[in-house]
Amino acid sequence: MSSYGGGYQRESRGDSYRGGHDTGYQNGNGYSGGYSGGGGYGGGYGGGYGRGGGAAGGDRMSNLGAGLKKQDWDLDSLPKFEKSFYKEHPDVAARSEREVEEFRKKHEMTVQGRNVPRPVENFDEAGFPQYVLSEVKAQGFERPTAIQSQGWPMALSGRDVVGIAETGSGKTLTYCLPAIVHINAQPLLAPGDGPIVLILAPTRELAVQIQAEISKFGKSSRIRNTCVYGGVPKGPQIRDLSRGVEVCIATPGRLIDMLEAGRTNLRRVTYLVLDEADRMLDMGFEPQIRKIVSQIRPDRQTCMWSATWPKEVRQLATDFLNDYIQVNIGSMDLSANHRITQIVEVVSDFEKRDKMIKHLEKIMENRSNKCLIFTGTKRIADEITRFLRQDGWPALSIHGDKQQQERDWVLNEFKTGKSPIMVATDVASRGIDVRDITHVLNYDYPNNSEDYIHRIGRTGRAGAKGTAITFFTTENSKQARDLVTILTEAKQQIDPRLAEMARYSGGGGGHGGYGRWGGRGGRGGGRGRGGTYTASNAAPLGNARRW
C-alpha cells in the first residue's frame, strides 16, 4: 500500500477486510460485560473492573507525553491522501447570494474565512454517498440542524474547520458523517496501522456518546472504532487498538498512555477532531493536546468544535489549523439557550434543601420528567444524594471519584428514567448527552458564567423547552452582574434581590426542611447490587417513596 491515491470506493471495505467485526461497545465502557448474566444490577459489575483506578476521577495530568518523540515531518515523502469530497448540489448553486444570506440570518449563522461553501437546506443537498444518506434517514431526522447545514459542506470540502455552537446543536453528526466519508476514501488499514480518524474529547462520558453516534452511522461501512479513556482497565482498549480501528475516540491522558506504551500510533491520522476544545483547555489538557497533535502529520484535516470562543481557544486554532473556515451559530457573546426558562432564587445555604424538595415535588408530578442537580463539590453531591434517597427520592449521583462502571450504570438508570433524578458535579456538565432532561437545578452556583451556560444547556435540547432553577447565595455575589446580563439577554425575570446584588453585592437567608414524593413499587432502590457502589448510591430508599 504505497500510495494513498483517490477514488477508493466503499465497496472495497468489504468482508475480506473486516470479517464482519465491529467493536461497537465492546471496549470497556461499562456495558459489554456489565449487564450480561448478572441478574439485574448485582453480578454484572462485580468483576473485571477492580483495578480501574476510578478514584482518581480520570486521566493523570502529571508529565504525560514526556516519552513521545518529536516528529520530523517531510511532507514530500508522506503518502498522498484524499480529503476533498464536496460537490455543490445544483439547487445550492442556483440560490442567489441574498437567499443564502437570509438563510444564514434566519438560523443566526455567521461565517468567516476564504471561500466558505454555501449552506445546504436538506440532507440530499449535502452530497453524502447513498450509504451515509440511508443511515441518516433511517434515524428519522427531518432536516439538518443549523450547524449541520453549514458544517457539512465545510467539513466535506477537506478544509480545516472551526465550529462554535451551543451544546445540543447537533455538532457530533456534523463531524461524524464527513469522517465516515473520509475513511471510506482511504486505503484499508494494514497490520500495525493506527486509526485514520482521531476524536479528542474532554470527558469519558462525552467520548462514549460520540462512540454511540459513530457506531450507529458507521455500521453499514463496517467502520471499527474504540473508545480510549481512563478509569477502566486498559486491556479491552489495547485489544481493540491492536486489532485495528479506523476511528479512535479518546480523552487526552489515556491516549498518551497508549502512545507511550507503543499500543498505537497516529501515523495514519488524516482527520482530527477536537471536540469541546474550550472544555479541554478548562480542564488543563492543553499540554497533552499539543503533544498528541505533534504526532500527527501536519497536512491532516482538522475540525475544532467549541461552545465558546475565548482567546485560548483562538490561539489553539491558530496553532493547529491552516487557512481555516469558521461557522458560529448564535451570538458570540455569552448567552443562554432561549428555549430554557431560567429561575434564579436568592437563598441562604440553610434554605437550599427545603427549596430543592419543594421544586422536586412539583417537577416529579409529571412522571416523564428528568431532573439533573448540580453541586459544587463531590462531597455535597454524595450528601445530597444520600439525603434524597433516605427521604424516598430515587436519586443517584455521578462524579469523578466514582469508578467508571458505577458512572455508566448511574447514567443508564437516568437515561432510561428508572432514576429520574441525577446529582452531578461539573464533570457531567458537558460530557453527558441525555436529550430529554426537562429540568436542571443548580444547587450550588458554578465558579463562572461559562459553566452556568453549559450546565443549564443540559436541558432544552434538540428544539425542546426546558427549565433551569438556580440557587444563588451571597457567596456568589461577585458573579451577580454576569448572571443578570445573561438573564436580561434571554428576557428572563430577575429576582429583585439578585439585581440588588449585581449593584451592591447584597443577599438574604432562611431555614431547612423536608417534602413528599409518591411511590414506584418494585424498584428496589440502592439494595441488592453486590456492594460494588459507593455509599451515596447504595443508600436505601426511605419508607415514604416519593415517586
Curated annotation (Swiss-Prot):
Reactions mediated catalytically: ATP + H2O = ADP + phosphate + H(+)
Location of this chain's protein in the cell: Cytoplasm; Nucleus
Region (Disordered): 1-37, 509-547
EC numbers for this chain: 3.6.4.13
UniProt keywords, alphabetically: ATP-binding, Cytoplasm, Helicase, Hydrolase, Nonsense-mediated mRNA decay, Nucleotide-binding, Nucleus, Ribosome biogenesis, RNA-binding, rRNA processing
Residue span, Helicase C-terminal domain: 355-502
GO cellular component: cytoplasm; nucleus; ribonucleoprotein complex
Biological process terms in GO annotation: alternative mRNA splicing, via spliceosome; nuclear-transcribed mRNA catabolic process, nonsense-mediated decay; rRNA processing
Signal peptide feature range: none
Residue ranges of every copy of the Helicase ATP-binding domain listed in the record: 152-327
Comp. bias (Gly residues): 509-531
Gene3D superfamilies on file: P-loop containing nucleotide triphosphate hydrolases
Superkingdom per UniProt: Eukaryota
Annotated positions binding ATP: 165-172
Classification via InterPro entries: DEAD/DEAH_box_helicase_dom, Helicase_ATP-bd, Helicase_C-like, P-loop_NTPase, RNA-helicase_DEAD-box_CS, RNA_helicase_DEAD_Q_motif
Bias (Basic and acidic residues): 10-21
Protein name per the record: ATP-dependent RNA helicase dbp2
Motif (DEAD box) on chain: 275-278
Pfam family, one: Helicase_C
Source organism per UniProt: Aspergillus fumigatus (strain ATCC MYA-4609 / CBS 101355 / FGSC A1100 / Af293) (Neosartorya fumigata)
